Design a protein with these regions (language model features):
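Hydrophobic targeting/anchoring helices
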Residues: 44-50, 55-56, 160, 222, ...
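A conserved amphipathic helix/loop scaffold
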Residues: 470-665, 682-683
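Glycine-rich, aromatic-flanked loop segments that form ligand/cofactor-binding clefts
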Residues: 69-124, 155-166, 218, 222-233
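Helical hinge/lid and interdomain linker segments adjacent to catalytic or ligand-binding clefts
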Residues: 46-47, 422-508, 603-604
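Catalytic domains of carbohydrate-active enzymes, especially glycoside hydrolases
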Residues: 29-77, 81-84, 147-157, 257-262, ...
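The substrate-binding groove and active-site-proximal loops of carbohydrate-active enzymes
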Residues: 53-66, 122-142, 192-210, 235-237, ...
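Aromatic-lined carbohydrate-recognition surfaces of secreted/lumenal glycan-active proteins
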Residues: 27-37, 86-90, 158-162, 197-246, ...
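Active-site-adjacent "subsite" loops/lids of carbohydrate-active enzymes
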Residues: 87-152, 186-204, 212
């Protein structure tokens, strides 16, 4: 092993000079919208994003009824339709049977799967194990996959989901990696917290190494062919991986020179994972999605890496179209509440969305393809992402309250020890949901990023706990102490009696003899080890210690009162940042768009009223409204025509994408494209009431479709991926 685990984390914190040169960030590409598909182009899935990530040299392991298209043929089919073509595949699993069965190098490699304590391999699909990424496997990935896609002219590579299951760690392949990494024999992770911590640090390192090696090779091989290869990591959020008990390198990758960016893989499937609030476990899709997207933004923002936000109109688990629609609106709204992110993966697997059969309602066994009203709404929504601006506007609510996170959140989830449990990641949600549910747009900050001055630049009060994570390097504490000394405020929650406090780590080895990791931080600020609950001054700042684990704030009804009272007092009296405002909604004005979320389980059941000259973008009929009430548990998405430049005719909202626009003194024409078997609907701004509306040369003008107040015409027709020609005359 050439680099220690601690050195990896130092680099992730912006403290490694070799990586700092890369941390300024490479040039971002021009792709704003993209999607992933393992299929060749076909008219039913032609969603008209800027780019497509063609999935897998051999496709997706779950593909059925393949038609035998080669990778190169699939790429060509999309290029012929005007798409920029990129490549995506899994780094932890994939269509790699030629490796597992020995076709590649003459040796079977099924023993390199991730294995549980019972000796069972963890499978992603038939003959598709989750992998312990050995050096031999990485050689295979470079030679058989990366080289081939670059030879096909692909210049952007997405290696998704670097995942090592927390319950794995018992295979012979893992034992070999353990011996090489630590220099001593493997130890079963279930036998002690120490072993669990060691095992999970190794899992973290193995996929850090894997992506570093594969991406470095991709860039070097591309350079030899005169190509500038971009490399991205599509990954779940730290919130989700921690909750699902998966270990992944996450934040440390952002500072690697070979990593150009990420896709934040957040969707209904991740965000509906139940969590606790006010003593009740429940799905809270909007709130969880908001925290997931936030953790991805804060993880990369200081590094300048490109970030795509993903949403999915359905999910992996078969449910019904009513469920899919409601939760898609929630996750879609959550992503838009981050105005500094404006690049999107608009959907994964359009073949599954447009061609899959799902229940028409929760109380019906009938299955059908996506309803017309939902495909129309979905296409209107994703088409707006092609024009979504970044914005300096902020979400409504009290600013400056952040929750500290660490990659080590993933290290303490499984197995449990000494009876200490953290149900559904409640030590994290216990700091987040009491505020978020009351309309406070809490942010997250990553301990690995504290070396970047931007990490805490907008934080007034930092909430932290070591009950569910540990600092992986003492340097982070130096940054925190310096921040407090200059006037920062920390609210530390923790009994510091979880079993991972005693693992052999930097705070209790060598010259350090601290019983709890927090005692090292406290010592830097003149606070005694094991300090009692209370308030402590350091420099211009304040530390308040609450001797309760954050899970206690949400596992029982009303358990968050003292926590909330303390946060509010620290914010107003110590940070002197004003009064913490409680409400049941979030609102953001983003260019011409209004984004609204109204929460249940909050401070009131009052609706949020949006006013203006509004196109309702969640309504497939695109009505123009003067106001609309959004009730708790629902979201709203609107274009306000009062904020649209009236500088000529234009398509304002549509379920198709517009090309070849031409404007003359008394006419406006264009070509629209979208998948077959879907409804085309457009609300078009015009300088005057039209006298003629032509669709493919046929007159379709209907006076009832003209709205004089908004000066817009509502046009509908059948979509066509080959193009529909439209012309307005006035």
């Amino acid at each position: 092993m050439k680099r220690t685990f601690a050195s990896i984390l130092l680099c992730a914190a912006g403290l490694c000079s070799a990586l700092d040169a890369g941390a300024a960030g490479p040039q971002k590409d021009s792709v704003k919208t993209t999607f992933q598909s393992s299929r060749e182009w076909r008219p039913t899935i032609d969603n008209r994003a800027d780019a497509v990530m063609v999935y897998g040299v051999g496709g997706n392991p779950s593909d059925k009824n393949r038609k035998g298209f080669t990778f190169e043929e699939r790429v060509k089919s999309w290029r012929d339709r005007g798409y920029i073509t990129h490549f995506m595949t899994g780094i932890a699993w994939g269509e790699y049977q030629d490796y597992f069965t020995g076709k590649w190098d003459g040796k079977w490699h099924l023993d390199e799967g991730q294995v549980t304590v019972k000796g069972d391999t963890i499978w992603h699909g038939h003959m598709v194990p989750y992998i312990v990424p050995s050096e031999n496997y990485l050689k295979y990935m470079k030679e058989q996959h990366v080289k081939r896609v670059i030879d096909a002219g692909i210049n952007s590579i997405f290696m998704e989901e670097p995942e090592f299951w927390a319950r794995a760690g018992y295979s012979e392949a893992f034992k070999r990696e353990w011996k090489e990494y630590y220099g001593f024999d493997w130890r079963p992770q279930h036998e002690s917290p120490e072993n669990t911590y060691l095992a999970n640090k190794l899992k973290y390192y193995l996929y850090y190494r894997a992506l570093n090696e594969v991406f470095t090779y991709a860039k070097e091989y591309g350079k030899s062919k005169g190509m500038d290869i971009k490399c991205y990591v599509p990954t779940h959020s730290l919130v989700n991986y921690s909750q699902w008990q998966i270990v992944s390198p996450e934040a440390s990758l952002a500072s690697l020179p070979c990593v150009d960016g990420y896709i934040a893989q957040v969707w209904t499937g991740t965000s509906r994972e139940p969590n606790y609030f006010n003593g009740k476990a429940a799905e809270r899709v909007f709130e969880t999605a908001y925290l997931e997207y936030g953790s991805m933004e804060s993880m990369t923002a200081p590094t300048g890496r490109k970030m795509f936000f993903l949403t999915d109109p359905i999910e992996d688990w078969p449910r019904d179209w009513v469920d899919y629609k409601h939760n898609y609106e929630a996750t879609f709204t959550a992503q838009l509440l981050y105005p500094n992110i404006a690049d999107y993966e608009i959907m994964p697997w359009p073949e599954r969305i447009y061609e899959g059969l799902y229940k028409v309602s929760p109380d019906s066994d009938k299955k059908d393809r996506i309803p017309r009203h939902y495909s129309t709404q979905m296409q209107v929504m994703v088409n707006t992402l092609n024009f979504m601006p970044e914005s300096s506007n902020k979400v409504t609510g009290t600013k400056g309250i952040s929750i500290l996170m660490s990659n080590s959140l993933m290290f303490q989830r499984f197995p449990t020890h000494q009876g200490y449990d953290d149900p559904q990641l409640s030590n994290f949600y216990g700091q987040a949901l009491p505020l978020l549910k009351r309309g406070v747009p809490v942010k997250t900050a990553h301990i690995e990023n504290l070396g970047f001055k931007e990490a805490l630049a907008n934080t007034e009060v930092l909430l932290m706990s070591y009950s569910n994570m540990k600092p992986l390097d003492p340097v982070a504490h130096e940054h925190l102490a310096a921040w407090v000394k200059k006037g920062g405020v920390i609210l530390y929650s923790g009994r510091d009696n979880d079993p991972f406090q005693t693992v052999q780590e930097w705070w209790n080895t060598g010259d350090n003899h601290y019983e709890a990791a927090s005692d090292h931080l406290f010592g830097l600020m003149g606070i005694p080890a094991g300090a009692e609950e209370g308030e402590y001054k350091y420099g211009k700042g304040t530390v308040y210690i609450m001797r309760a684990d954050p899970k206690e704030y949400v596992l029982t009804a009303g358990g968050d009162k003292k926590f909330l009272d303390t946060v509010c007092r620290l914010y107003s009296e110590k940070a002197k940042a004003g009064k913490v405002e409680f409400k049941n909604s979030f609102y953001l004005e983003r260019g011409p768009y209004d984004i609204v979320a109204v929460m249940n389980e909050s401070v009131s059941d009052a609706p949020y009223t949006v006013t203006g000259t509004l196109i309702d973008l969640f309504d497939p009929q695109l009505p123009v409204l003067k106001s609309k009430d959004i009730t708790p548990g629902y979201c709203g998405y609107f274009m306000d025509l009062d904020r649209v430049k009236k500088d000529g005719p234009k398509v304002l909202a549509a379920s198709n994408r517009t090309y070849d626009e031409e404007v003359s003194k008394n006419s406006y024409s264009y070509v629209s494209k979208s998948p077959v078997h879907t409804t085309g609907i457009s609300r078009v701004l015009l300088p005057a009431r039209p006298s003629s509306v032509l669709v493919n040369g046929t007159e379709v003008f209907d006076a009832g479709n003209w709205d004089n107040d908004s000066m817009t015409y509502l046009l509908t027709y059948e979509n066509n991926p080959d193009g529909v020609s439209v012309k307005f005359v006035w």
